[in-house]
């Protein structure tokens, strides 16, 4: 359920401050550590609050606590009359319901059913435990506490460990409306990246000279090596920019999401399964690669899965292989001669002819499936610790030109 909410006036905010006091954390990050929140009330009734950091960090499939505590005069109001409500901010004035509790009655909504519950760590604890975290859980959450007369609320931001990757489909660059960019990311095991995630990726070295949609409807691109074809010698309009020679985020602002077309910047997180490479005795067209993965109880890996395996599981393979969208790519953690450049990254050969061009294939196997048996296909795994099935050291393979 999504609802719009009107802003409270100053009087209402002051009234809330005298009644129910909600504590959440405004800055910083933690990784599942228990929060300690102290509340001190002076004789005059003024309140001094200390809170723990309000940004929590998890990953896909993880379990996280969104911290929230409250305090008020229990003698005047019983705890059974307090309503606790969690919502997710989907737009500046739009919220979707996550969880609500009134006394012993608890209810989770939508995709949060079966995954969300109160921590229940004593009186005044409104913290929410969220299990099996998904990509869609990323974002800001509001914790609201209400008694008979007053209410107060605070925000907690849930961040995810992961990787940002630029994407365009076979049709070429600058072909996606905003809605099409959302679908393209979802098809490649991702979501549209946020501006904060793109900024973090830029700080981590991402350099990409094509503009793409972000989840807030803006269009930006990150430049770490300023050059004239990529917006000149300085960034504009976003953090890290400002026209200096150090690069930054080039920002086109908010664009018409149904008429204008750009690429997409997608975000993905930890893989529940793993990616491995199958190398046939002879390279195969795309249709043969798909059959080979299926024979191993796997599917052709998606672009986001390959990026996650490269970034988070350190998959390093100096051989191009088919991916599910028909592109051919390969992941490099340790740059070396004849492997496509001096920087780590996922190299792309674009979208080769699916019937005439021949490659191996990157496969993705879901959790619980057995390891592939070495045989006619060489194979590797996302841990990057070695290679079986008679595969040669990647550094000795035929050079790839990208």
Curated annotation (Swiss-Prot):
Disulfide bonds join 68-143, 185-266, 209-230, 293-363, 318-339. Essential for the proper localization of brevican (BCAN), mainly as a perineuronal nets (PNNs)-type deposition in the brainstem and cerebellum thereby playing a key role in the formation and structural organization of PNNs. Contributes to the formation and transmission of inhibitory GABAergic synapses between Purkinje cells and deep cerebellar nuclei neurons. This is Hyaluronan and proteoglycan link protein 4. Expressed predominantly in brain. It holds the Pfam family V-set. InterPro entries: C-type_lectin-like/link_sf, CTDL_fold, Hyaluronan_bind_Proteoglycan, Ig-like_dom, Ig-like_dom_sf, Ig-like_fold, Ig_sub, Ig_sub2. It comes from Homo sapiens (Human). GO terms for cellular component: extracellular space; perineuronal net; synapse. Residues 1-29 form the signal peptide. Transmembrane segments: none annotated. One of its GO terms (molecular function) is hyaluronic acid binding. Glycans are attached at residue 132. Belongs to the HAPLN family. Residues 163-268, 273-365 form the Link domain.
């Amino acid at each position: 359920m999504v609802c719009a909410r009107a802003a409270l006036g100053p009087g209402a905010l002051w009234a809330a401050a005298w009644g129910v006091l909600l504590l959440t954390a405004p800055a910083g990050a933690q990784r599942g550590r228990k929060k300690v929140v102290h509340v001190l009330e002076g004789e005059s009734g003024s309140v001094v609050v200390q809170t723990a950091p309000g940004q929590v960090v998890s990953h896909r499939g993880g379990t996280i606590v969104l911290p929230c505590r409250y305090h008020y005069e229990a003698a005047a109001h019983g705890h059974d009359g307090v309503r606790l409500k969690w919502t997710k901010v989907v737009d500046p004035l739009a919220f979707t319901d996550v969880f609500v509790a009134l006394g012993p009655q608890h209810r989770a909504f939508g995709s949060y059913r079966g995954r969300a519950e109160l921590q229940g760590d004593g009186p005044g604890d409104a913290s929410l435990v969220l299990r099996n975290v998904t990509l869609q859980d990323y974002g800001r959450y509001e914790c609201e506490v209400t008694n008979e007369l007053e209410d107060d609320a605070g925000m907690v931001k849930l961040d995810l460990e992961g990787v940002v990757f630029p994407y365009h489909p076979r049709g070429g660059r600058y072909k996606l409306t905003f809605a099409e960019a959302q679908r393209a990311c979802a098809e490649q095991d991702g979501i549209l990246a946020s501006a904060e995630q793109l900024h973090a990726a830029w700080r981590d070295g991402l350099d990409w000279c094509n503009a793409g949609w972000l989840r807030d409807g803006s269009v930006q691109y990150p430049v770490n090596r300023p050059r004239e074809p990529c917006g000149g010698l300085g960034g504009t309009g976003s953090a890290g920019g400002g026209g200096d020679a150090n690069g930054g985020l080039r920002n086109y602002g908010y664009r018409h999401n149904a008429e204008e077309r750009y690429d997409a910047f997608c975000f993905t997180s930890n893989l529940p399964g793993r990616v491995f490479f199958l190398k046939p005795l002879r390279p195969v067209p795309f249709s043969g690669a798909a059959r080979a993965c299926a024979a191993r109880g796997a599917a052709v890996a998606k672009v986001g899965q390959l990026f996650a395996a490269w970034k988070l599981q350190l998959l390093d393979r100096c051989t191009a292989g088919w991916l599910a969208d028909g592109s051919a790519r390969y992941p490099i953690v340790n740059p070396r001669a004849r492997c496509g450049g001096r920087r780590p990254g996922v190299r792309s050969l674009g979208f080769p002819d699916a019937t005439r061009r021949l490659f191996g294939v990157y496969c993705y196997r879901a959790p619980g499936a057995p390891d592939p048996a070495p045989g006619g296909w060489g194979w590797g795994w996302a841990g990057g610790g070695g290679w079986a099935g008679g595969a040669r050291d990647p550094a000795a393979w035929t050079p790839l030109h990208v």
